[in-house]
């Protein structure tokens, strides 16, 4: 502590054991908020005295949907003398989180929303460091993405059969790819009339498919959002609220999916050989590899199959 001229440290530890138990150790930070069924949950705490310091220990058996919010004291200090006389109380922070958690945001986005709100309460000039960490307990959710036709046309049925037999939601990316998928399902491709003005191509619809989008331009935008989500996460409002294909893919991959299966065709689309295009689309594989790496960094399990 530079003010008091003494060495000083607080800590909060949330240790997850086998995805079934959370062990929490806390010293001199605001108490970890726990939400269960969307509401504040008063979990048990045991006080330990170590060298005159009060350490609080907890062991919580996890349930699906549990949310843990850890923070530094810069969060409840937000707004002192500006928005609030005595800062943003932990009870008020709890109310704020109870309001946003049911929307299904990722843990990363929830922590971003909390810190952003603190920044606003500080008048965008924080008087203390505001750090937040959110843990969300959820079940595994498989997701499947079909991107590009196979190099060998004879492999179309095999590729489609493997793709559609997988558990979970199904996303089809690309015009030719969607035509092949529709033919396999015995359905037609319908361009959706409900899309917003955007530099991302419009989505389409195929009965039996959860989302149908354009290919390379859309996936490239998803990669841009993924890189931002791994960093400052400043663009989360765009993809979390957008109605374009890239935003919809982001919500499925970033917020819903835990296990993602890519089915990637190696056929070359002549339309993507245009040297005047602003992005090099010649090697579709690069996009898949780049997106896969981003998703792995988000903690997703990734499997890529090429055809």
Model-derived features: positions:
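Catalytic core of PPM/PP2C metal-dependent serine/threonine phosphatase domains
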Residues: 1-38, 55, 108-135
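PP2C/PPM family metal-dependent serine/threonine protein phosphatase catalytic domain
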Residues: 2, 30-59, 213-218, 224, ...
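Acidic loop->beta-strand submotif enriched in PP2C/PPM serine/threonine phosphatases
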Residues: 7-11, 42-81
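Beta-strand-turn-beta hairpins that frame and shape the catalytic cleft
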Residues: 18-21, 63-65, 227-229
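Active-site-proximal, acidic helix/loop segment immediately C-terminal to a metal-coordinating Asp/Glu
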Residues: 62, 67-117, 270-277
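Non-transmembrane, aqueous-exposed alpha-helical and coiled segments at domain scale
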Residues: 108, 112, 139-169, 178, ...
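Extended, low-complexity intrinsically disordered regions enriched in serine/proline/glycine/threonine
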Residues: 174-175
